[in-house]
C-alpha cells in the first residue's frame, strides 16, 4: 500500500500523481471560457501520457521515496510530445466548436481524475479522492463534463459507487456527428479496452471513422471486441517488462494489417508508439 499512499499524497500536494508544472497541462487552451456548467476535461492525460513511462521506472523504489518532488524539474515531456498533445486537444476543441458545442475549461484549477488509483486497485484512496473532486465540481457549479480519454471517463463514472456524483459525463466522440477524414486509404484501429469492453463506445468512434472516408481494416483475431489485445499500458506500474512485451506484440499485430494505426487513448499511444508510428483519432478526422 506504500505506492497508493505515495500517489494519494502527491494528489493532495500537487493535484497530480507526480509533480508537474501545471502550465504543461493548460497551455494548449486558446480562447476557451473559464469554467461554466459544461467543461471540457483533460485530466492532463494527453499532456503527460509520455511521462508515465519515465515515472514507472521509479515504482520499485516507492518505499524509499518520501516524495517525488525532486524529479519535478528534471522530468517533463519533450517539445515534440507536448506539441503533438496540444494539437490533438486543440483539434478536439475545434471539432466541438464547429458543431456548436459550448463549453468552458478549468485551466490551472482542473483536477486529476484519480484514474491511476482506481486502476491499481487502491479503492480506499480512490474513494477518498473521488469525494474531494466531486465536492470541487459542485463548488464550481459544473453539471456536464466532456471527456477526451477512456481512463478519465471510466474514473468519473465509477465515482458514483463512492460518492454523490451527479454530473453528466459524455465523451467528445458522442457530440461530433459526422466527421471528415484528414487522410485517405486504409487504417487499422486499436481499441481502448475501456472504451470497447466496458464503456460501450467502440461503435461510436468506429462508425465515425467508417463514414469519414477512410477504410477500416478488420481481422477477427486482431480487431474484434472479444479477441483484440490490450496495449499493455495499464500493467506498466506493476510489471514494466510484461507491459513492453505486450506492446511489442500488439504493434506487430496491427501493422501487419495496415501501416496506419489509429488509437483513441493517449496511454495506448504512449505504449505502442515505441514500436510503430501511431495516430490519434483526432489527428485523422476533422
Predicted region positions:
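Iron-sulfur-cluster electron-transfer modules
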Residues: 1-110, 118-147, 153, 159, ...
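Short, flexible loop segments at boundaries between secondary-structure elements
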Residues: 165-187, 220-229, 276-286
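Redox- and metal-dependent alpha/beta enzyme cores, enriched for Fe-S-associated oxidoreductases
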Residues: 183-241
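A short, acidic, amphipathic alpha-helical segment used as a generic capping/interface helix at domain edges
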Residues: 134, 242-259
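Phosphate- and divalent-cation-binding pockets in alpha/beta enzyme and binding domains
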Residues: 112, 154-158, 270-274
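Ferredoxin-type iron-sulfur electron-transfer modules in oxidoreductases and energy-metabolism complexes
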Residues: 1-11, 242-249, 281-286
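Helix N-cap/beta->alpha junction signal
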Residues: 148-150, 264-266
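Short cysteine clusters
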Residues: 44, 113, 193, 231, ...
Amino acid at each position: 500500500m506504500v505506492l497508493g499512499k505515495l500517489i494519494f499524497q502527491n494528489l493532495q500536494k500537487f493535484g497530480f500523481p507526480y509533480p508537474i508544472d501545471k502550465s504543461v497541462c493548460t497551455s494548449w487552451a486558446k480562447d476557451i471560457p473559464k469554467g461554466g456548467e459544461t467543461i471540457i476535461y483533460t485530466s492532463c492525460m494527453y499532456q503527460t501520457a509520455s511521462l508515465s513511462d519515465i515515472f514507472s521506472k521509479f515504482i520499485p523504489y516507492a518505499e524509499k521515496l518520501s516524495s517525488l518532488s525532486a524529479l519535478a524539474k528534471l522530468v517533463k515531456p519533450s517539445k515534440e510530445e507536448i506539441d503533438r498533445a496540444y494539437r490533438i486537444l486543440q483539434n478536439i476543441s475545434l471539432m466541438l466548436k464547429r458543431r456548436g458545442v459550448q463549453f468552458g475549461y478549468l485551466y490551472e484549477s482542473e483536477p486529476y481524475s484519480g484514474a491511476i488509483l482506481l486502476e491499481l486497485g487502491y479503492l480506499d484512496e480512490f474513494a477518498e479522492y473521488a469525494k474531494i473532486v466531486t465536492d470541487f465540481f459542485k463548488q464550481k457549479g459544473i453539471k456536464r463534463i466532456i471527456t477526451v480519454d477512456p481512463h478519465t471517463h471510466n474514473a468519473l463514472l465509477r465515482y458514483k459507487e463512492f460518492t454523490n456524483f451527479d454530473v453528466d459525463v459524455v465523451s467528445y466522440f458522442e457530440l461530433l456527428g459526422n466527421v471528415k477524414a484528414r487522410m485517405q486509404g486504409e487504417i487499422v484501429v486499436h481499441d481502448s479496452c475501456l472504451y470497447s469492453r466496458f464503456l460501450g463506445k467502440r461503435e461510436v468512434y468506429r462508425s465515425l471513422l467508417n463514414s469519414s472516408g477512410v477504410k477500416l481494416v478488420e481481422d477477427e483475431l486482431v480487431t474484434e471486441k472479444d479477441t483484440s489485445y490490450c496495449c499493455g499500458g495499464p500493467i506498466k506500474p506493476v510489471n514494466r517488462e510484461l507491459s513492453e512485451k505486450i506492446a511489442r506484440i500488439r504493434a506487430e499485430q496491427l501493422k501487419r494489417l495496415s501501416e496506419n494505426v489509429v488509437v483513441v487513448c493517449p496511454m495506448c499511444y504512449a505504449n505502442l508508439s515505441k514500436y510503430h508510428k501511431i495516430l490519434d483519432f483526432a489527428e485523422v478526422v476533422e
